């Protein structure tokens, strides 16, 4: 079994790690950074991922996709999708299956597909470091992700060419990294406030056992929401000062978004910052500049309710675990937003204890995923991870009631069966509608899917016995079966959301990803070939000018001919042809090298001769002498 990489697929940034010996290690990307922006851009048919996509976002906002994790596994009618549509510059559209997709340059992409581009970048980063192909991964998701979101994340891995061995909850991964080298038994809380989601998990750890007691959270609460509050503040302040509303200007909005994120980070260590954006817009009177002084106190006032919103899930998680805040022995902070002093203050106040800041909040989740990868491929032993399902699972029964089969915070993997019956006389088929959530009525919860059990023998209502079994695997993905005990008829399915990607769609996306990978590789080869050719043309022309008088007319003609031939193909799209002409010019220009060497040798020889003359002259000494014989 090869190396299993651990990937933290984040809303704002992503990170990849691997077990190296007995320790997990974060792998730097090609830009030398330990995290990669979860941003994809499309520019004139070319796909950019990570930092390169982020750099051009200001000039290409409509074709730059970020925070797509907040859309993954969601239906287009989801209120959170509507909320997202109001704040992102790119186009969110309804897919044929009812899911929320993004449309860029006239082409629709599923959130799983966009996420796959980021996962491919993580995969390449690991492969470049390890020097070998990587095919298996552990990918993290927010603990409060539902089945549809987990399935969509697994699909993203498949599209990226990865076998996803395990989907692991982010706080659980962080706890693994925190407790990996510790043997003491402790009850800890992991408070994870990232770019787009919030989770809190309560765990008991000790002697290599990591047992999740409860989890809670909000899959639409994170740094993006904090940025939006600052963005709104800047827009309103500028409108008050200039009378201009920047909401309908995508370029200005992108600049404001970047400025908001930068100001938020600066105010974690400073009390005040200046936001200066020259030429933000223009009107009839000329260009307008934005210059706003922004303080930490103003920021805290803007986001106070968002911070407070994270405390209620902490309260619920403690209650579900049967614990009090005073029972928690360590509070581990995860996610970039936990660097904010006001966030730390609120968490410290709730738990009534000092916070553990000994882990890097941006990297700890990927490190934990790498450890889990090590467990799965037997590199790491003596670790047992017991996670839970975040939401209750059940079916719709008579009157639209949600009947739970598996309660939230049940340890997974888990299996539970319950017997139901028919609602009408002589009913020959039943529809099993599967839901996930905590509301009492099925319609108020998330519908995961449905299937039919047919061929039930005619009988009065209430007589047939239909056994429904829920089976949750270690990834938190649900499998459901229904069996008529009398006839033995059984229907078994892995639940897929009513939307979601079909196997055929995933297969097509895998092929597209492979094709794109080949095209990207060819494009890179072409760029490198053109750069090498351009560099050679420049150096050859320069040296030809300096040493043309030292070349024979035949050699000079050969170099000029090869030079013209390379220039003629420089704009072509054929990398092999450019390489061929580059090699020809390299061979021809060796004559210039010989001429340069000869010229330098001749100059050296002339210098030596001159030196010898000088030396021999220096040995002649003028002296006065006396002719003794004449005396």
From Swiss-Prot:
Residues 603-612 have a biased composition (Low complexity). SUPFAM superfamilies: Actin-like ATPase domain (SSF53067), Heat shock protein 70kD (HSP70), C-terminal subdomain (SSF100934), Heat shock protein 70kD (HSP70), peptide-binding domain (SSF100920). Keywords: ATP-binding, Chaperone, Nucleotide-binding, Phosphoprotein, Stress response. The keyword Cell membrane does not apply. Induction: By stress conditions e.g. heat shock. The keyword Ribonucleoprotein does not apply. Gene3D superfamilies: 1.20.1270.10, 3.30.420.40, Actin, Chain A, domain 4, Substrate Binding Domain Of DNAk, Chain A, domain 1. One of its GO terms (molecular function) is unfolded protein binding. The modification Phosphothreonine is found at residue 197. PANTHER family: HEAT SHOCK PROTEIN 70KDA. Belongs to the heat shock protein 70 family. This is Chaperone protein DnaK. It comes from Rickettsia bellii (strain RML369-C).
């Amino acid at each position: 079994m090869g190396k299993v990489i651990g990937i933290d697929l984040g809303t704002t940034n992503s990170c990849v790690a691997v077990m190296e010996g007995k320790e997990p290690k974060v792998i730097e990307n090609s830009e030398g950074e330990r995290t990669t922006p979860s941003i994809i851009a499309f520019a004139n048919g070319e796909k950019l991922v990570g930092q390169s996509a982020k750099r051009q976002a200001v000039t290409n906002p409509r074709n730059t996709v970020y925070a797509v994790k907040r859309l993954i596994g969601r239906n287009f009618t989801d209120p959170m999708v509507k909320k997202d549509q109001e704040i992102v510059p790119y186009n969110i559209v309804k897919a044929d299956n009812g899911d929320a997709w993004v449309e860029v340059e006239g082409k629709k992409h599923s959130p799983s597909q966009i996420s796959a581009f980021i996962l491919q970048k993580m995969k390449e980063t690991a492969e470049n470091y390890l020097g070998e192909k990587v095919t298996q991964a552990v990918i993290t998701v927010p603990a409060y992700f539902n089945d549809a979101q987990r399935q969509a994340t697994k699909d993203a891995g498949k599209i990226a060419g990865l076998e996803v061995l395990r989907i692991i909850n982010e706080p659980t991964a962080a706890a693994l990294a925190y407790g990996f080298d510790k043997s003491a038994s402790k009850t800890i809380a992991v408070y994870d406030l990232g770019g787009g989601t919030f989770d809190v998990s309560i765990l008991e750890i000790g002697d290599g056992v990591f047992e999740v007691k409860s989890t809670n959270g909000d899959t639409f609460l994170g740094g993006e929401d904090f940025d939006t509050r600052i963005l709104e503040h800047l827009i309103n302040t500028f409108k008050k000062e200039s009378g201009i509303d920047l909401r309908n200007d995508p370029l200005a909005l992108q600049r404001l978004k970047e400025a908001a994120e930068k100001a938020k980070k600066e105010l974690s260590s400073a009390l005040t910052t200046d936001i200066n954006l020259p030429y933000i817009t223009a009107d009839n009177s000329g260009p307008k500049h934005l210059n706003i002084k922004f303080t930490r106190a103003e920021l805290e006032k803007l986001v106070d309710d968002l911070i407070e919103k994270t405390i209620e899930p902490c309260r619920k998680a403690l209650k579900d675990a049967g614990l009090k805040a005073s029972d928690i022995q360590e509070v581990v902070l995860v996610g970039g937003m936990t660097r904010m002093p006001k966030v730390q203050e609120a968490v410290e106040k709730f738990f009534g204890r000092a916070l553990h800041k000994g882990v890097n909040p941006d990297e700890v989740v990927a490190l934990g995923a790498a450890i889990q990868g090590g467990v799965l491929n037997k590199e790491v032993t003596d670790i047992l991870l017991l996670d839970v399902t975040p939401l209750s699972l059940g079916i719709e029964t008579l009157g639209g009631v949600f009947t739970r089969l598996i309660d939230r915070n049940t340890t997974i993997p888990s299996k539970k069966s319950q017997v139901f019956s028919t609602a009408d006389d002589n009913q020959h088929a039943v529809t099993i509608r599967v839901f996930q959530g905590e509301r009492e009525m099925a319609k108020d919860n998330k519908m995961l899917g449905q299937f039919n059990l047919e061929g039930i023998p005619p009988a009065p209502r209430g007589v047939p016995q239909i056994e429904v079994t829920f089976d949750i695997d270690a990834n938190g993905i649900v499998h459901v079966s229904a069996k008529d005990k009398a006839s033995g008829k059984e229907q078994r399915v892995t639940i897929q959301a009513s939307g979601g990607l079909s196997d055929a769609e995933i297969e097509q996306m895998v092929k597209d990803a492979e094709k794109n990978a080949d095209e990207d590789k060819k494009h890179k080869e072409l760029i490198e070939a053109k750069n090498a050719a351009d560099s050679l043309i420049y150096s050859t022309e320069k040296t030809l000018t300096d040493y043309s008088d030292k070349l024979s007319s035949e050699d000079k003609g050969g170099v000029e001919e090869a030079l013209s031939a390379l220039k003629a193909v420089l704009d072509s799209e054929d990398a092999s042809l450019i390489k061929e002409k580059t090699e020809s010019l390299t061979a021809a220009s060796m004559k210039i090298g010989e001429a340069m060497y000869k010229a330098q040798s001749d100059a050296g020889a002339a210098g030596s001769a001159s030196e010898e003359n000088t030396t021999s002259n220096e040995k002649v000494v003028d002296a006065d002498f006396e002719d003794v014989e004449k005396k």
